Amino acid sequence: MFWKFDLHSSSHIDTLLERDEVTLKELMDEEDILQECKAQNRKLVEFLLKAECLEDLVTFITEEPPQDMDEKIRYKYPNLSCELLTSDVSQINDRLGEDESLLKRLYAFLLNDPPLNPLLASFFSKVLSILISRKPEQIVAFLKQKDDFVNLIIKHIGTSAIMDLLLRLLTCIEPPQLRQDVLNWLNEEKIIQRLVEIVHPSQDEDRHSNASQSLCEIIRLSRDQMLQVQNSSEPDPLLATLEKKEILEQLLSNIFLKEKNESAIVSAIQILLTLLETRRPAFEGHIDLCPPGVNYSAFSVNKNVLAAIQERLPSFHQLLLDPPKTGVMKTTWGILDPPVGNTRLNVIRLIASLLQTNTHSINEELIELNTMGVILDMFFKYSWNNFLHTQVEICLALILASPGDSPEHSTISEQNSTGDHVLLKHLFLKCHLIDRILEAWAMNEKRQSEGGQRYGYMGHLTRIANCIVHSIEKGPNSVLAHQLIKDLPTDAQERWETFCTSSLGETNKRNTVDLVTTRHIHSSSDDEIEFKDPGFSQDSAIQQFGFNDEKFADQDDIGNVSFDRVSDINFSLNANESANIALFEACCKERIQQFDDGGSDEEDIWEEKNIAFPQETQRRSSSGSTDSEESTDSEEEETVKQGLFESSTVNHEDKMEVDANEASNWTANFDIPMETAHVASLDSVGSDAWSTEEPLSSKETGWASFSEFTSPINTKETIRSSSPVEMETSTEPVDPLSVNASAQTEVTVAMDAVSDGDEEGENADQMTETVMNGSMKETLSLTVDAKTETAVFKSEEGKLTTSHDSACKYGVVENFDSAMENAPPTQPSSSSQEQRTSEQIVLDGASANGPV
């Protein structure tokens, strides 16, 4: 898309193409020529389509560059030429596929003597492969005209790029009929026979490897094609040719000459393994050591392959005893002379594949040769070769897990023979598998007890022993295996049973991965409810964790949550679960009860709301203030404070509205026991504190007079705050003579409204109100002259009586500061502004709080 829509920046190539004498090399020197070509620059494509330019491009990839050139730029033009020709531009592909002269020039590269230049061979193979893919009819027709094409391919098969070209010819042709024609053509050219001839000791290792890989890929591709096109009328000719008995005999005869060549033997075994390979090997990955049975795939092994291998089993067995000569190998733990070698390892892999077929005749041949005994000897001899141990383990597992001998691949004479599992009997009776396992285990324990190193095969030996136990208990041959254990000598039986219960059991327990908790949890049907799937997506919950802000918690971004499951959640909480909880709730009720109002029992006392008062209450000029730090409305505080100085006209009939039941039920109880020096009982205080009669006369010396104070606030606008007010504890020191440190205190403020300021002896309208002060140490009486608007504080000394009645809920405690006693006398109405300011400060210091 980048090249198609011309999203790249402009280059210098367009400027060069405007010149008449521009050359191909000048354009190839530009860094962005490849990008311009893929973008199908019209001028550039037209320039490259010139006959001389295409010839130069093909020449660059088919001829060796000069030797005297610098190595850094020697293959610059061949590489760019290959990339330009394979840029998948349709015009270039069409011109190459239709111009026979260019194809001949390209084909001439195969006429060079071997070995070919690997880099140029890769360029040639890449260009011809894309032509086969884009122009299959033209290229196949051209190659068929060349009689020596297959010979040249076989000649240069040692070059990997040529082998890739052969495989491309088999895979890149999509039309089924054309592909079938190519297969028939290659089969007629006897390409299979020629590849088999290469697997010969006289050829070099590269030719062995590439020829073997080519044959293996042909087998796999042919079988895959058979699966894809199941209704194909014609079988794959190349696969059918390779599975012929004479071809297989030729392959095996080439490797078993007097001169043993490891490369040729390994390459031939790779071809045989591919022929024996089913669609998916039963033990690929070796996941399950003891499968209940061997699963055969859709591909059945050709009888010709089994017959050809069976004839050469003695030769393969001899390779185990006498492999090709190899040098001495030095390892970290010792010297291997001779080492296992790649030959013997591949022979054991071949035997494992033969055991998977479970053919009776092959099993009989292996028993006669005692091949399994030789393999077991190698298992214990080479204690550190895990490749060998894995293959031996697979062989034993196949024998133990496979059913009786299958007559599927047997001849008519073999079908009349016994159907017993002869190979399993051979393992227990002739190979003495149980005895060898016990001996090796004992040797390892002895070696470890002496401080030696553990044998490297012990892990595989443990798995083999577990496989035997599994086969005896649950395997397809459990009856026969159990009988074979009983047929062992008594001593061997006892040792095996002891080994299974002690050593093997301890090893398995040690190798078992325990859970984090050591306590074994036994599941039951009741646990299903506890392990229900959550009703939300765990991934979305993790991603949304911590994003509580609205811009991160959009409903569209949250995973699909099943809200219907919320109803399934059952919360069963016991209110009396803890005594501490009940005690805490009772304490909270006691502290909040003093703020309760008869008409707002169910309201939230801490909720801020508008307060409406009856008209009768608004006529009174009473207010309370608090210095609490919890207060949030500063204007309300100022209004409450200024309310102390407002004048009001109060009738004699106006009294404090107190509910008798509420007053009697009001309780103030604190956790800390307190002792009061002066406590007034309910009987003595209740009649005086709430009465509207003229208060007792007391000495007024030491108190300020605010006769000239004028309140700027209208009396009618004054309201009485009914909201609960938090008490504030004063930081002033407590007089130890009058107030105990833990005593309950109550401040009584008496406000007297005097109607006639000239007659001091007449009875004046008064209003008294009891207010709880947070300082808990002052008892004050405030008398306000309604006419002259004079406010006088009076101390209530001697008015309160002490009561020791435990039922008393109200207490009045007097506490006077020495500073208050030394206050200046009452000033006339002509007092200065400074005096009124100081008096107002003193007045503001007295905080009056009353019950709601």
From Swiss-Prot:
Report residue spans for region: Disordered. 610-653, 714-742, 817-852
Q: Where is the composition biased (Acidic residues)?
A: 627-638
Q: What does the record give under GO molecular function?
A: protein phosphatase binding; protein phosphatase regulator activity
A GO biological process of this protein is: regulation of signal transduction
Ranges of Polar residues compositional bias? 714-732
What does this protein do, in the record's words? Regulatory subunit of protein phosphatase 6 (PP6). May function as a scaffolding PP6 subunit.
Source organism: Xenopus laevis (African clawed frog)
What would be the name of the gene that encodes this protein?
ppp6r3-a
Q: Which InterPro entries match?
A: ARM-type_fold, SAPS
Q: What is the lineage of its organism?
A: Eukaryota, Metazoa, Chordata, Craniata, Vertebrata
User: Out of the domains of life, which is the source?
Assistant: Eukaryota
Q: Compositionally biased, Low complexity: which spans?
A: 828-840
Task: Kindly provide the name given to this protein in its UniProt entry.
Answer: Serine/threonine-protein phosphatase 6 regulatory subunit 3-A
UniProt similarity note = Belongs to the SAPS family.
Any one annotated GO CC term: nucleus
